[in-house]
Amino acid sequence: MTYIYNIYMSYSRGNLDRYIDQRLNRFYDQLISQRYAYSIPGIPGIKGDKGLTGSRIFLRNGIPQNELGTNGDLYINLLTDDLYFKNDSFWSLVGNLRGEKGEKGQLGIMGYKGEKGEIGSQGIKGMKGSDGLNGSTILFGQGLPRPYEGENGDVYIDKNTGIMYKKINGIWIPQVGLKGSQGDQGYKGDQGSKGDKGQKGEFGSAGFKGDKGDMGQKGETGAKGDKGDKGEGSKGSKGDVGNKGDKGNKGDKGIKGDKGSEGIKGDNGIKGDNGTKGDNGTKGDNGTKGDKGDIGDNGIKGDKGDIGDNGIKGDKGNKGDNGDKGNKGDKGDIGDKGMKGDKGDIGDKGDIGDKGMKGDKGDIGDKGMKGDNSTKGDKGDNGTKGDKGDNGIKGDKGDNGTKGDNGDNGTKGDKGDNGIKGDKGDKGTKGDKGDKGTKGDNGDKGTKGDNGIKGYKGDIGDKGIKGESGANADKGDKGIKGDKGDKGIKGDDGSKGDKGYNGEIGQKGDNGEKGDNGEKGDNGEKGDKGEKGDIGEKGDNGEKGDIGEKGNKGSKGDKGEIGSSILFGQGIPSPDLGNDGDIYIDDNTGILYKKLNGIWVPQTDIKGEKGDKGESGQSANKGDKGDKGNGGEIGNKGDKGSKGDIGDKGNKGDKGDGGIKGNKGDKGSKGDKGSKGDKGDKGDEGIKGDKGNKGDKGDKGDIGSQGIKGESGSAVFKGDKGTKGDKGNKGDKGNKGDKGTNGDKGNKGDKGSKGDKGTKGDKGIKGDKGDKGSKGNKGSKGDKGDKGDSGDKGDKGDKGSKGYKGDKGDKGSKGYKGDKGDKGIKGNTGSKGDKGSKGDKGEKGSKGNKGEKGEKGFKGEKGSKGEKGSKGNKGDKGDKGFKGDNGIKGNIGVKGDKGDSGIKGENGLKGDVGDKGIKGDKGNEGDKGDKGNKGEKGNRGDEGDKGIKGNKGDKGIKGSEGDKGIKGESGSKGDKGEKGNKGYKGDKGDKGNLGIKGDKGDKGIKGVKGTKGDKGTKGVKGTKGDKGDKGTNGDKGDKGIKGTNGDKGNKGLEGDKGNIGGKGDKGDKGDKGDKGDKGDKGVNGDKGSKGDKGDQGTKGETGLSIKGDKGDKGEFGLSIKGDKGVKGDQGYKGDKGDKGIKGDKGDKGIKGDQGIKGNKGDKGDKGNLGDKGDKGIKGDKGIKGDKGIKGDKGIKGDKGIKGDKGDKGIKGDKGDKGDKDDKGNKGDKGDKGDKGIKGDKGDKGDKGDQGDQGIKGESGASVFKGDKGDKGDKGDKGDKGDKGAKGDKGDKGDKGDQGIKGESGASVFKGDKGDTGSQGDKGIKGESGVSLNYVMSYYNATPGNFSSPVPVGASIAYVSTVGGGGGGSYFRRLNVGIVGGGGGGGGGALFRLPLSVMPGQSLSGVIGGPGLGAADSTTNATKGGDTIIYYGQYTFIAGGGNPGINSAADTASFIKGGDGGTVTNPLLTTQPTPGTGSTSTGSAGGNGQMSFYCFSGAGGGAGTSFTSSSGGNVGMFPGGNGVTTTYNNAGSGGGGASAFDKGGNGSIRFNPPSSGTKGSGGGGSVQGGGGTIPNDGYPGGNGGPGFVSIDYYSS
């Protein structure tokens, strides 16, 4: 049977000491005592309000930092077992859980049972406290927990072994054994004085009729029974003899327990009214939060734009406003509910809650004290029959019965004597009286009470002595405990056991009252979020102004995140048990586990040395405990007193006080968010002015656009993805971004006239190969344009020197992706005006020198980016830089208005993409992630233009191929889709640097196919890895110049994109050549306005972590989180609107264009593409002929700009792919090239702002995702604790902005990853994989000692190892003929055993060598060596496989195969059984077995005659094949498999046996056909050597 208890803990020094010292150490013993008292649940009371969120417990290495956790939380230093308590924002050392083993104390004198304390006056009903978080559930059972049991965070205690498991990510992971060493049994306390009990006994004489039964023998006298008439009382006097009443066992009759009806006390349950709070559900009004739309104001964040333009994302920081969602936080007010503590009275019922402690329940034994039940004794009246004469003496026992009358509880005091009473204990049945407990239902609130356990329960631990109670009489001693019973009053709460009704919590509705907070609902108006309006002038965002009053605490926010749960169980926790962040304590071993990323990882052993039973102390005085009766004001809980005994558990009830958290108070009005203030007109996007100096990275803005999906996998946290600096010189190949969606297939433009071949610009320096972006979606195959004349392959300009990648500015708001539209501008493409003559393709200008590519370094001034108002602050998340990742890609957010992308304004200057040069800081490329932009490769579509292939020339740069790693880009090949002009297959070249193969692009010209010659470069294909650099794909790097495209910056005016309208003349596209300047794409910055998308940010992290302000989320743990309530104001999240200002982020803008991808939705702008109608312009794609420009692809470094991919729509031009002839223009792919600007993707770094996604923060066990906090608002969901109330979760609605999906996985806090938000462009796909934050791996297969130092930053190690395989034996000539040798057994193995580690320490051990096969008939094969792992005081052994065994008898018909290796896993009480070697002539060796993190080895096949025997299997790895040689009928045995490889095959004549690998066994021998008899065979196969593989991750 599994018992489930919900524990809500409140902490005080005293309670902690009790909880740790008494409860844990004795809990197991109590459980084992099986002294469970069950009370018949009374009628459930109104469901009480949910209790306050409990405190959280942090388990980490080292001293806690004050910024960690919230007041009331606990912190355990796993290195020292020091316990800290947070109070007044500081962590104070409370003590050490590992205490010295105390000397066994002297048995204290059993004190007199104290008087039962007066039932305290009914306390004033406290304010209804906020619903607390659902506490961890403690499950009890026998044996391993079942996967489907419990929820993440729950604890399971295996009563058989004492092992505690915690459920993390659906898996029960062993944590610690609560069961300490069996303490010495305390001395049996002196039996308390029998007490006055006897008084009422007089009547009792009749009572024991049962006892009389004993007298029954005398029954003969029974006839005298007639005399019974005389019994009328006179005989009753004899009742005095009743003392004999001890026999009171008859007391069982105690059923009188019916008195339990008294349970009516349940009236206390009325407290349930609190439950009404359910109205809180109304909180839904908070949904009005829609005002969030106002968030546009948030735009202020725009300042962040300065960040590197991307920084705007920082506005997302406003997301903090999202925090307003916090209004839900008001739910935190429920914290006030803490007052509910009064409900604590019900808490008495809570005692049953204690049942959770079940062990304590033992105290219930005291219930035996229930002697009141003795009252049942009244049944004794039956005893009257006692007159039966002398039996009456038995009657004395009856007196005991009388006690029964006392049972009315009054006598209870006597119960103290109850020790003796113990017999009466049977009467304990009275427990039924517990029904009275019904009142207890009210007790549900009491559950809160469980916290009440307060540890006093620990005293119950003494109850261990109670064990004596088994004698029943001794139990009486336990009775002493009875004093605790006084608390029992609270006991009524005990009925609470019914808490199961918790479902009732639906009542939580009462919480609804908080609903008034709902007022915030007005904020709801925000609903219109409205237009997102014009991202507004981002302009004045500045005011953001009065976030003002924080408004009314607003409706109680969503329930705070459910705190970490503490689960108890016996044995290793099941994987499906508990949630990330939960703690599991193994009662068997005391090991404490924490669930991380779905895995229960052992943390520490809180069991400590079980001190000697310690001084039983003056248990005697325990009596005083009676005072507890006051129970605080809980007092009047009513008469339940009788039940009281069970009540002892009651203390738990007090937890209610935790409620006091109470007034978390009004979060402060937060006031009305104040009018969000008009989102100022987005003011003129302004000149976009010179790109000012990259201002300080503003505060990390709001999560901004949904942002990148962020890491998938279990990443612990992707870490901050720094902002991707400006893509300096063709910056490093960005990470392969996600394959962008195929853009709309552009109209097939007219085939422009083939422009003049531009002069080959100087080949720029091949920038670092950017990370290969994800293979973009294969764009729609544009109509194959007329194959333009293959333009002259322009000289591949010198690739400008890779400028310093400027600081990765904050990824602008992703600016208006729209701008990509201007691609039309694409430099001199000039007005593109009349396609007219296709102009001279302009000069392709000089390609403008590619500007200086200016200092791109500075990424221009990015101008002041206007005032960008103050929002600047959050701007700094800026650095998230780190890919953030991908963030949710959010809703792509509103994509806001993409709107002003037009402003993109100046992109204007882009002007000097010139120095793109700085690329300098590719620096933050850190987020290689941005490579994601490469994702754009999607444009690959332009493969078409491969035509230019021309400049394959610079392929030389390919140098960066190094990034080939990126090969990923090959993915981009996806765009090969463009293959449409299959003819152009050429661009496949983009398949990566595939070598410059890109030039193969010229093949595009396919006419020019001759150029395909460059395909030769394909040889470079090797570089394919660089496909990422595909950018280099020739000077496509200059495409970077595309940078001139940078002027595309003016594109910013994308509004002018209208000009693209001119596109009609597609003809001019020829000038595309200028694409080069794209460099300034930097201006893309203004894209910043996208900022408004920020609102999506709200998704906040789904994660648990605070990640940010989520702090309000309060510590994930049991903490009150209450304050989070304040977050309630989140409602204002609307203000996030200010994020709108984020617009300024526009400066990022340049990249911003990509950023839009987030808005990719805006791809709609592609609508501008509508102008694409002019795609004709693409016709100029012929210009693409300038593919040479592609050289600038180097700019790709700006991949960041990938944002432009958004315009991928432009890809439409790809339609011109028809011009693929000009494929040279593929360089235009370069427009993807703009993706090149992607280099700016560096700005994507700003994507970092998505970092806010980072908030996703912790999904998993994270302690606190860090700032994710804003998601924190989601935190309010926390109240979900009342799960019933979950309704409130509704507020989560804001999540709408899913925005930052943030990290998925267990990441503790993806950190700023959020910034990736801007990625909007899937490009960031960034990194996938295990985001536990992989640190490094260690692998060693050399037999002997090894030591692997734990790397810096690592906290988790996954260890895989195997012992050496056994060697195969030699064949034999026996009477039955030639018998083949037996195969060796496979080694035992450990697989991905999770261990928590600490940098500076080392994992060491011994690697087992291979067993050697028998060399000849005179030698024996040897056993494989054991591989040993030393982990602190634990030793894990992967045993070596055993060798094939030679037979000593000439008459044998087989040679036995070796047995598989064993495994020694300290986590298991029973190790997996190894496969046995085969002994028969046809049966395979036994298969290896599997258990937690380990496998035993399989047995080897037997050597036989006429038949063969294969080795056993392990999982999917088969044993080696046995082989029979028909020449001499000798059959060899195959080696047994290991968990990592198949066994070696047996030998066949003329073919030697195979040796094992990775710990598998070697095959057996047979005659080789040569040599000298009897050693004319092959030596047996050797076993495979053992190895150790350790993967280190940070958590």
Curated annotation (Swiss-Prot):
Residues 97-155, 175-233, 236-295, 299-358, 380-559, 608-907, 920-1039, 1043-1102, 1128-1307 form the Collagen-like domain. Residues 1558-1585 have a biased composition (Gly residues). The keyword DNA-binding does not apply. It comes from the Viruses. Glycans are attached at N87, N134, N274, N280, N286, N373, N382, N400, N409, N1345, N1420, N1545. The keyword Cell membrane does not apply. May participate in the formation of a layer of cross-linked glycosylated fibrils at the viral surface thus giving it a hairy-like appearance. This is Collagen-like protein 2. It comes from Acanthamoeba polyphaga mimivirus. The lineage of its organism: Viruses, Varidnaviria, Bamfordvirae, Nucleocytoviricota, Megaviricetes.
